[in-house]
A protein has these predicted regions:
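Catalytic Walker B motif of ABC-type/P-loop ATPase nucleotide-binding domains
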Residues: 210-214
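Conserved ABC ATPase "signature" region
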Residues: 31, 36-40, 156-181, 229-232
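Helix-to-loop junction immediately C-terminal to a conserved catalytic motif
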Residues: 93
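ABC ATPase NBD Q-loop/coupling interface
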Residues: 102-122, 161
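ABC-family P-loop ATPase nucleotide-binding domain
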Residues: 1-53
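The feature captures the beta-strand-to-loop junction immediately N-terminal to the Walker
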Residues: 78-80
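Conserved ABC nucleotide-binding domain
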Residues: 112-113, 172-188, 193
């Protein structure tokens, strides 16, 4: 385990030990600390995975995977098919329970104790490769539903929106390049625009961590560039984990200095700048090719 992972793990362990002492002394309950709505980012770590292993019928999809994502960081995850990228995100979002290991959001939320809806409420949102929007509704209505996600579809559409809510939707529309398309039916948007709309719907939920699975798959070159611009504006306010195969897009996001993680056979094969991992002989052999 690398020194930065050891440091992150030590901080989280210390936080949990403090909570245990408080609970035994009659203070705040340990369960409440782990399941609280607000993640504690005091130590600067947004997401911490330690020795996560997952097996399916004898196949190890994740093999003692350890990873730490800092608050406000954008991390690109690359690797060959079957490397464990999707399973990793399934564990983070509660879709898959690991055989062993630890997964924490901030220093106080144990993700392995939460169900999928609780993880979303804690501030983790996931975007799949294929966009999922309400195609029969307008772009604005899609964002309205996302903003009022505690209501049903019908109730949300007929509820009166406040001024701040309308302003928030306008901000998101501007951010995701869809302001001119606000009242267009979502089903008429291009593939890239649907991707932007879904990202906007996630942003309406005010996530602290965004998990993005091949977000530019099927996009034009222009849409890919504008998506990179969008993600770069989110850095700092949100933490982002971007799973991607498009090395040109990864280069746009990392800008020569952000860290890239390479997965292989369920564990971390290499980490560093894009240039560093591209020159790594192991990465070349198993993923990039010679």
């Amino acid at each position: 385990m690398t020194p930065d992972l050891q440091k992150a793990g030590a901080a989280i362990l210390e936080r949990h030990q403090q909570a245990t002492v408080a609970a035994s002394a009659g203070g705040a309950s340990f369960g409440r600390t782990l399941l609280g709505d607000e993640p504690d980012f005091e130590h600067g770590v947004a997401l911490y995975l330690e020795e996560i292993s997952v097996s399916f019928d004898g196949f190890k999809a994740l093999n003692s995977l350890s990873l730490a994502i800092d608050v406000g960081e954008m991390r690109c995850i690359i690797g060959p098919n079957g490397a464990g990228k999707t399973t990793m995100m399934d564990v983070i979002t509660g879709k898959t329970r690991p055989d062993s290991g630890r997964a924490h959001f901030g220093s106080n939320i144990d993700l392995l104790r939460l169900r999928e809806p609780q993880i979303v409420r804690a501030g983790i949102c996931r975007k799949f490769q294929k966009p999922t929007v309400y195609e029969e509704l307008s772009v604005f209505e899609n964002l309205e539903l996302a903003l009022q996600n505690d209501r049903g579809v019908r109730a949300a559409l007929f509820a009166r929106m406040s001024g701040p809510q309308r302003e928030r939707i306008a901000e998101i529309l501007q951010l995701v390049h869809l302001l001119p398309e606000a009242y267009r039916i979502a089903g008429l948007l291009s593939h890239g625009q649907k991707q932007w709309l879904e990202i906007g719907m996630l942003l309406a939920q005010e996530p602290r961590l965004l998990l993005l699975d091949e977000p530019v798959a099927g996009m034009t070159d222009e849409e890919t560039e504008r998506t990179a611009e969008l993600f770069l504006t989110l850095v700092g306010k949100h933490s982002l984990v971007v799973v991607e195969h498009d090395m040109k897009f990864v280069d746009m996001l990392t800008q020569g200095h952000r860290k890239v993680t390479v997965l292989h056979e369920g564990s971390v094969l290499a980490e560093g700048t894009l240039a560093e991992v591209q020159s790594n002989t192991q990465v070349i052999d198993v993923y990039l090719g010679r």
